[in-house]
């Protein structure tokens, strides 16, 4: 039996990834409806992919016969996620699931009442290059340093390679109210005294850098302390980049750097794991491409020979 799924949010990530992939997995999923506050976007996506229903209200989607919903609309996603859980729908939430710990606790509470499955979109845990690197890291008992570097261009440079459509039919009032809710959530998370650079750096952590952080946690576990944090500011006071150093109970350190470099097309995201006898380097492709990442392993074998193995992970069909 196929899972009947509905999608909330018809922007770039839905058009580039979610709807095409779910369509390819037609033996397992049936997209029965899409929803967006932009009626034009919802109608376009429904017509292009021959999806039978489109909505501008998530309540209407939840009142249909969907088994599950995929939430990839503009943050925050808390309200619609909780409505979906209360409606008894299984929920997949694009990162971040929310912006405050209190909202996570609220989702967990509602989930425990309903018994549905709620999952967040931490897809890079299943990136073949990452899976390979993690299995290699599990053989190391002398990890001393992990280095994450994420030099992020404007997503538009990569999204423009795909057939996407944008529409201008969302009211200014709705845009402003959504922005206020998001800003209020950031204030709840950081406090009233947080400056603009901290607020924008926090959204970087909740945005593109979240992939690096959950990947790091999946390999190293929970750090024992934060040793240092620095935020670079733009002239307008927003965050240009962030760097921090974490320490783990083993004594290992992790250095994490994220920079917004909007104008150059090149996407540079790496995970490096250093030990005395083995080094692993994962190079990620942009999040809008299909598996094109690589994992380089340098090590000394049992005979004392130095080896270098570069693994390229090409696109493999999702079925």
Q: Where in the sequence are the language-model features?
A:
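C-terminal glycine/acidic-rich active-site capping loop/insertion
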Residues: 165-169, 173-196, 270-319
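N-terminal Rossmann-like dinucleotide-binding module
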Residues: 1-49
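Beta-loop-alpha module in the N-terminal Rossmann-like domain of NAD(P)-dependent dehydrogenases
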Residues: 44, 49-110
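Hydrophobic residues in well-ordered beta-strands that form the structural core
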Residues: 93-94, 118-120, 282
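A contiguous active-site-proximal alpha/beta segment in oxidoreductase catalytic domains
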Residues: 99-179
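Contiguous beta-strand/loop segments that form the cofactor/metal-binding neighborhood of enzyme cores
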Residues: 196-288, 317-319
């Amino acid at each position: 039996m196929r899972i009947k799924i509905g999608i909330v949010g018809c922007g770039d990530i839905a058009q580039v990834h979610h709807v095409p992939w779910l369509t390819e997995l037609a033996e397992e999923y049936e997209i029965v409806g899409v929803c967006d506050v932009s009626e034009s976007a919802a109608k376009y996506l429904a017509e292009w992919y021959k999806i039978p229903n489109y909505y501008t209200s998530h309540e209407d989607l939840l009142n249909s016969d969907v088994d599950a919903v995929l939430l990839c609309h503009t943050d925050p996603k808390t309200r619609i996620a909780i409505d979906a859980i209360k409606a008894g729908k299984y929920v997949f939430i694009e990162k971040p699931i929310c912006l405050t710990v209190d909202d996570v606790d609220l989702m967990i509470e509602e989930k425990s009442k309903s018994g549905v499955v709620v999952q967040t979109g931490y897809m890079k845990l299943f990136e073949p290059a990452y899976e390979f690197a993690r299995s290699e890291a599990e053989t190391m008992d002398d990890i001393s340093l992990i280095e994450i570097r994420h030099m992020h261009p404007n997503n538009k440079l990569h999204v423009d390679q795909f057939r996407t459509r944008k529409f201008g039919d969302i009211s200014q009032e709705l845009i402003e109210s959504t922005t206020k809710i998001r800003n209020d959530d950031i204030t709840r998370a950081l406090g009233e005294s947080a400056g603009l650079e901290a607020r924008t750096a926090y959204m970087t952590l909740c945005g593109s850098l979240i992939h690096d952080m959950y990947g790091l946690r999946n390999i190293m576990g929970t750090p024992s302390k934060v040793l240092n944090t620095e935020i670079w500011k733009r002239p307008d006071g927003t965050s240009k980049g962030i760097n921090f150093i974490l320490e783990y109970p083993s004594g290992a350190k992790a250095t994490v750097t994220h920079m917004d470099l909007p104008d150059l097309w090149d996407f540079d995201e790496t995970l490096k794991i250093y030990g005395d006898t083995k080094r692993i380097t994962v190079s990620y492709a942009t999040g809008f491409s299909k598996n094109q990442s690589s994992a380089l392993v340098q090590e000394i074998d049992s005979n004392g020979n130095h080896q270098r193995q570069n693994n390229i992970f090409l696109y493999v069909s999702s079925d």
